[in-house]
């Protein structure tokens, strides 16, 4: 074999190794990005649910404060015996 053929074979092998390394890094980064998107979606869903449950509890608080204003200090504690 001539030196040019040997050099071209070595160059192809090196190029293949570099391509494998680069695509492996790309694959790992894509997995990280997709995992982070899933985490972000879960965090958004948790925030939405927390906001929803917070709104419901505010409504309950308003109803309880309205009862207290009507004269019932403790709705569960009635001593009318």
Swiss-Prot record:
Q: How, per the record, is this protein's activity regulated? A: Ion channel activity is inhibited by hexamethylene amiloride in vitro.
Q: Which gene encodes it?
A: vpu
Provide the disulphide bond pattern: none
Recorded protein name is: Protein Vpu
Q: Cross-referenced Gene3D superfamilies, in alphabetical order? A: HIV-1 VPU cytoplasmic domain
Q: Name one GO cellular component term.
A: host cell membrane
Cytoplasmic compartment residues: 29-81
Organism for this UniProt entry: Human immunodeficiency virus type 1 group M subtype B (isolate SC)
- InterPro entries in UniProt: Vpu, Vpu_cyt_dom_sf
Q: Which residues form a coiled coil?
A: none
Membrane-spanning residues:
8-28
**Keywords of this protein's UniProt record, alphabetized?**
AIDS, Apoptosis, Host membrane, Host-virus interaction, Inhibition of host innate immune response by virus, Inhibition of host tetherin by virus, Ion channel, Ion transport, Membrane, Phosphoprotein, Transmembrane, Transmembrane helix, Transport, Viral immunoevasion
Q: How does it assemble?
A: Homopentamer. Interacts with host CD4 and BRTC; these interactions induce proteasomal degradation of CD4. Interacts with host BST2; this interaction leads to the degradation of host BST2. Interacts with host FBXW11. Interacts with host AP1M1; this interaction plays a role in the mistrafficking and subsequent degradation of host BST2. Interacts with host RANBP2; this interaction allows Vpu to down-regulate host BLM sumoylation.
Query: Domain note for this entry?
Result: The N-terminus and transmembrane domains are required for self-oligomerization and proper virion budding, whereas the cytoplasmic domain is required for CD4 degradation. The cytoplasmic domain is composed of 2 amphipathic alpha helix that form a U-shape.
Please give the HAMAP family that the UniProt record associates with this protein: HIV_VPU (MF_04082)
Q: How is it modified after translation?
A: Phosphorylated by host CK2. This phosphorylation is necessary for interaction with human BTRC and degradation of CD4.
Give the family, as the similarity comment puts it.
Answer: Belongs to the HIV-1 VPU protein family.
Q: Identify the domain of life.
A: Viruses
Q: Which residues lie on this side of the membrane: Extracellular?
A: 1-7
* Misc. comment: HIV-1 lineages are divided in three main groups, M (for Major), O (for Outlier), and N (for New, or Non-M, Non-O). The vast majority of strains found worldwide belong to the group M. Group O seems to be endemic to and largely confined to Cameroon and neighboring countries in West Central Africa, where these viruses represent a small minority of HIV-1 strains. The group N is represented by a limited number of isolates from Cameroonian persons. The group M is further subdivided in 9 clades or subtypes (A to D, F to H, J and K).
**What are the subcellular locations of this protein?**
Host membrane
Q: What does this protein do?
A: Enhances virion budding by targeting host CD4 and Tetherin/BST2 to proteasome degradation. Degradation of CD4 prevents any unwanted premature interactions between viral Env and its host receptor CD4 in the endoplasmic reticulum. Degradation of antiretroviral protein Tetherin/BST2 is important for virion budding, as BST2 tethers new viral particles to the host cell membrane. Mechanistically, Vpu bridges either CD4 or BST2 to BTRC, a substrate recognition subunit of the Skp1/Cullin/F-box protein E3 ubiquitin ligase, induces their ubiquitination and subsequent proteasomal degradation.
Q: Which GO terms describe its molecular function?
A: CD4 receptor binding; monoatomic cation channel activity
Q: How does it sit in the membrane?
A: Single-pass type I membrane protein
Q: Which GO terms describe its biological process?
A: receptor catabolic process; symbiont-mediated suppression of host innate immune response; symbiont-mediated suppression of host type I interferon-mediated signaling pathway; symbiont-mediated-mediated suppression of host tetherin activity; viral release from host cell
Q: List modified residues, type Phosphoserine.
A: 53, 57
